[in-house]
Amino acid sequence: MTPGRRSSTFTRLLRHGFTDPSAAERLLDGAGLAELRADPVLLEALGATADPDLALHGLVRLLEAQPDATARQELLDTLIAAKPLRDRLLGVLGASEALADHLARHAGDWQTLVTYEPRDLHRGVEEFERGLAEATDPVTLRVAYRRCLLSIAARDVCGTIDVAETAAELADLAIATLRAALALAEAAAPEDAARCRLAVIAMGKCGGHELNYVSDVDVIFVGEAADTGPDADEAKAMRAATSLAAHMMRICSETTVEGSIWPVDANLRPEGRNGPLVRTLSSHVAYYQRWAKTWEFQALLKARPVAGDPGLGAEYVAALQPLVWQAADRENFVPDVQKMRRRVVENIPLTEVDRQLKLGPGGLRDVEFAVQLLQLVHGRADTSLHSGTTLDALEALAAGGYVGRTDAAQLDEAYRFLRSMEHRIQLHRLRRTHLVPEDEADLRRLGRSLGLRTDPVTGLLRAWKRHASVVRRLHEKLFYRPLLDAVAQLAPGEARLSPEAARERLVALGYADPAAALRHLEALASGVTRKAAIQRTLLPVLLGWFADSADPDTGLLNFRKVSDALGTTPWYLRLLRDEGAAAENLARVLSAGRLAPDLLMRAPEAVALLGDGVAGGLRPRDRAQLEQETLAAVRRADDAVQAVTAVRGVRRRELFRTAAADIVGSYGTETQPVEADQGALVDLVGGAVSDLTSATLAGTLRAVVREKWGDVLPTRFAIIGMGRFGGHELGYGSDADVLFVHEPRDGVAEREAGDAANKVVSEMRRLLQVPSADPPLLIDADLRPEGRSGPLVRTLKSYEAYYRRWSLGWESHALLRAEFVAGDEELGRRFIELIDPLRYPEGGLGEDAVREIRRLKARMESERLPRGADPKLHAKLGPGGLSDVEWTVQLLQLRHGHEIAGLRTTRTRTALAAARDAGLISEEHTATLDEAWVLATRVRNAVMLVRGRAGDTFPTDPRELAAVGRYLGHGSGHAGDMLDEYRRTARRARTVVEDLFYA
């Protein structure tokens, strides 16, 4: 061979897409192909394949496998003369290494491809049955199956059948194979076959007539006794049916010298793998009527009798199909289906999520779930939607106005492309996978197999991401956009949801008042303004987020109120349109209960906090920042009323910021997962609200002093936080427990100083409770010496004298939480120095005092628990609740605080950790108490967020209870699970309390 000849061939091979032209040249020199190397038709045909190198290698192997020279020449002659055969054979060899292996083992099977013309009719089950008829055992069945598969793959890769036809033929081939396998099983056990009637119901993609190249074939078995007379032995018949079904599954699933066909999976049957393999029809019906979960009815959408007794199969479908179309009436139907979809995504390994073609975001399952959801909601009233095939169902949904035509067309295109990718990925080695390969050679072959010849890798990845993006954008919006079309003006000829269909869909989404919801949608989406246009774009997504809450009606109503208040404000529309997190954060906040929306409605401009830009951010501000802002507001004001109004406005805004951060952290969003550390959320809320209360008191104090006395009050004045306030554990609705301490300035009479201090307190309390748009802050000084009977304000000397002579045990106990919060810092420091010996007594608390604390605790439990309340569900005073944990920790502080520095803190969780570190409590007991305290605190926070008023027990209203559950991480319909979890957690904590506190 001359160098020029070689160079010319090398160049031609390179031009035709060979990646290793040198190796290709060597192959063309042998195996009788030398005469073809100059044939431009053959090289062009090889170059048209997905992988020319692989196709040539497979062709050489096929030629070498021919039994003799005559057979080899026949193959070569056919390749030259018959273009359809040439394109199909080389197309398969270039796309599927596994089918090339099959052809190398069964060298005559290439002739299967000769009999088909370029324009193919769909091959039905019966034709595939004829193709499998020669199979007499599992091995020959596998060979016949691969031969039939070869014909499907050949026409698929050549484009003479599209992806939907390919999937349908693969399903028909699977059905023919199930029938052949069942026939083999019956032939092996004729007595069993005579004893029973057995029907095979195809499920999943086989039932839906849309199977992959390599997939489990999902089935359900139904059996009955063949003899229906009085002497029929049902138990014996069911054993026979089970034996036949199991044998049929083995024939398909077991690996032989010819490999396996595919696994037959019967786990969609009632009770899954724990249930009997075969049931009678009546047993199936009883299960679905009493026990089936929502997803099981969704699975029945695709149920189709395919093998065995046709009459029994038809009876099965007739009995169960009516139940399928009642599934949408089940409580929490849509949330349950959507939650299951989210769970699938969450279970994808992180290393695979970006390559998941089927299960990942924007994948095939998103389209299938969305379509099935709509079918189940509207299928009871519209039988045109009763299809198990995704693309057929999508077309029917569009025709009926249940889905916008443009959306349906985009989803159809995306689904076809993604399914084509899935088919070609699996076809290469006939392995079950839904992962897009990472190897560049694999990506190149995959791209070329889909017709992307110019830069196939880049083109493939770009097209895949584009279609996945379309699916991700549309799959949930698909459910909501037609609701807007139902209340909007549409172009002539465009189908729309009927009012009844719109009502059905809203009810399925969890809306209690669908008529009101439609009115809100009409008000929000109607018109030609920029506001209406942006809201029409946003609402389909917002409706989905509202539906994910426990109260979609309130979420939509609140959005309308905010929109009415801010809709003409340019920054508001820009925020929702452009700030990635703002719209979802707003939806979560508006539908999570009453508190946050109420705070927002009083000043809708706080929506700006929900953005993810520089001006946004939900992280609460620290005490120094808050105090600086409140004091600046006071300086700008003309009088105390105006000043405190401004301070309360800051408090309202920051309460909203904290509540929004808490809600977003508890619910999670598309961009921010649920906060895994629930203790961190509790600390965030407690710290933020406590810091905000300190800053509010500091600003109010400054305003009152400035109004009455100018810059200097006649007496030094300090506010000491007590209880949860001092412990940095305030909730949204907590009062501010405080002590007031003052000290006359030099030259000021004690009476004058006392009058001034009392006037300050009185005016602060009045101004912070004046009815206004802002929530009041109640100041509670009942923990002062002598309680309500004692003076409201004392001097430092008076406190010292009282504590030295009259202090009771409960007062030392209460002082554990005392911390300076506002006013004269130096005076506050001296007060803390005064009380330290009381709360951390030298030598620890005596036994008499310990017994007194225990008696007081027991009395409080019996006297303060509200009448009629369930103690086991009372988050504050119930067993294992806040009081139990806090008193246990505080007893450890009183006994050991003098010697363990870590216990000298006002914060419960910090003190608990210090007790653990000091060996006073085990790691296990610490975790138990901490978990109970965090959960009880979150319950109280949730109740306040949901109801807009404080409470220590779970709500009795079902919707409010569901909203509390949603905040605590329990989906719709799982309020019972939430209550059980609380009882278990509290019960474990109570056991520890009895061991540590009462022992």
Curated annotation (Swiss-Prot):
<dbReference type="GO" id="GO:0047388">
    <property type="term" value="F:[glutamine synthetase]-adenylyl-L-tyrosine phosphorylase activity"/>
</dbReference>
<dbReference type="GO" id="GO:0005829">
    <property type="term" value="C:cytosol"/>
</dbReference>
<feature type="region of interest" description="Adenylyl removase">
    <location>
        <begin position="1"/>
        <end position="483"/>
    </location>
</feature>
<dbReference type="GO" id="GO:0008882">
    <property type="term" value="F:[glutamate-ammonia-ligase] adenylyltransferase activity"/>
</dbReference>
<dbReference type="InterPro" id="IPR005190">
    <property type="entry name" value="GlnE_rpt_dom"/>
</dbReference>
<dbReference type="GO" id="GO:0005524">
    <property type="term" value="F:ATP binding"/>
</dbReference>
<feature type="region of interest" description="Adenylyl transferase">
    <location>
        <begin position="489"/>
        <end position="999"/>
    </location>
</feature>
<dbReference type="Pfam" id="PF08335">
    <property type="entry name" value="GlnD_UR_UTase"/>
</dbReference>
<keyword id="KW-0460">Magnesium</keyword>
<dbReference type="InterPro" id="IPR043519">
    <property type="entry name" value="NT_sf"/>
</dbReference>
<keyword id="KW-0548">Nucleotidyltransferase</keyword>
<dbReference type="GO" id="GO:0000820">
    <property type="term" value="P:regulation of glutamine family amino acid metabolic process"/>
</dbReference>
<comment type="function">
    <text>Adenylation and deadenylation of glutamate--ammonia ligase.</text>
</comment>
<keyword id="KW-0808">Transferase</keyword>
<comment type="function">
    <text>Involved in the regulation of glutamine synthetase GlnA, a key enzyme in the process to assimilate ammonia. When cellular nitrogen levels are high, the C-terminal adenylyl transferase (AT) inactivates GlnA by covalent transfer of an adenylyl group from ATP to specific tyrosine residue of GlnA, thus reducing its activity. Conversely, when nitrogen levels are low, the N-terminal adenylyl removase (AR) activates GlnA by removing the adenylyl group by phosphorolysis, increasing its activity.</text>
</comment>
<keyword id="KW-0511">Multifunctional enzyme</keyword>
<dbReference type="InterPro" id="IPR023057">
    <property type="entry name" value="GlnE"/>
</dbReference>
<protein>
    <recommendedName>
        <fullName>Bifunctional glutamine synthetase adenylyltransferase/adenylyl-removing enzyme</fullName>
        <ecNumber>2.7.7.89</ecNumber>
        <ecNumber>2.7.7.42</ecNumber>
    </recommendedName>
</protein>
<comment type="similarity">
    <text>Belongs to the GlnE family.</text>
</comment>
<keyword id="KW-0547">Nucleotide-binding</keyword>
<dbReference type="InterPro" id="IPR013546">
    <property type="entry name" value="PII_UdlTrfase/GS_AdlTrfase"/>
</dbReference>
<dbReference type="Pfam" id="PF03710">
    <property type="entry name" value="GlnE"/>
</dbReference>
<dbReference type="GO" id="GO:0000287">
    <property type="term" value="F:magnesium ion binding"/>
</dbReference>
<keyword id="KW-0067">ATP-binding</keyword>
